[in-house]
Amino acid sequence: MNSHEWYKQAKYGMMVHWGLYSILGGEWKGKRTPLIGEWIQSYFGIKNEEYSRLASIFNPIYFNAEEWVTFAKNCGMQYIVVTSKHHEGFALYRSKADSYNMVDATPFKRDVIAELAEACYKHGMKLGLYYSQELDWHDPDGGGYDKTTGCSGIGWSNIWDYPDNSKKDFTKCFENKIKPQVEEILTQYGDLCLIWFDTPGVITKAQSLELHDMIKKYQPDCLINSRIGNGTYDYVSLGDNEIPDKLPERIDNTADMNGLGGFKYSPFGLYETAATLNDTWGYKYFDHSWKSPETVLKNKNHLNFMGINYLLNVGPDALGRIPSISQDIL
């Protein structure tokens, strides 16, 4: 079975959003963000000097890779997609490209991705990795500075530390951090079923192609989602929580290739919806807008009937625990 056939029959996976934002749980100095928890640095404009100190107290003593993997497997999921690095710029694995990572910057000093890769191999699960290839708020040249509206904070780009967007050069970030880190995750953790990119903006077609070609060089069977940007993908990620009523009668290739939602041409007919169980991706302790188990099952069956995979997210807390209510729903 090739990777396209596997993906089509997989149907159901678990996404995990976990990072320094999990420590805050949606609250900063007594104020709560009304938006998604993993965007809290942007929402409150928390400067890197202060935000990065969170790493010194990130010690998730209850993290257990086998528990995460066996939980997903027991829920009938076929693959797991974990945030190796989200927009905050902090990596959950040991990165030689940037010491702002779980092993070098926290008292935990364990490579979370390595442990998850081992657990997935042991239990016969596929591992995919999310990687934010455009937004990186920890880097002065992180992308996103072409957009001014529609985000869950005060800016797509880090305008609270680096307010002059005209001085930013994404190519520096791409060459010095993005490319080296993508190469790391491709070469350090065995076979990956997919790389899940996000929010393309200033990334050029040439840069998207560089990432595409690097992935296919190291892991020819690794699938690439549409948010890599510029049409260089294997399958289409629909919008966040997008549950279409029906498939369009015709799908052409005129859609915005960098758009985050809606149907666009998929070269192998592969589609996916990533979705939350409440109203946030990263842990937010006061978000109780939970979907019912019945709604989750209805959405899964509806999407799968149309041939669309359902990638359901959990947001573990700062100690590494998947919230009990998430487990109850699934």
Please give the residue ranges for each predicted region.
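Mature catalytic domains of secreted/periplasmic carbohydrate-active enzymes
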Residues: M1-L330
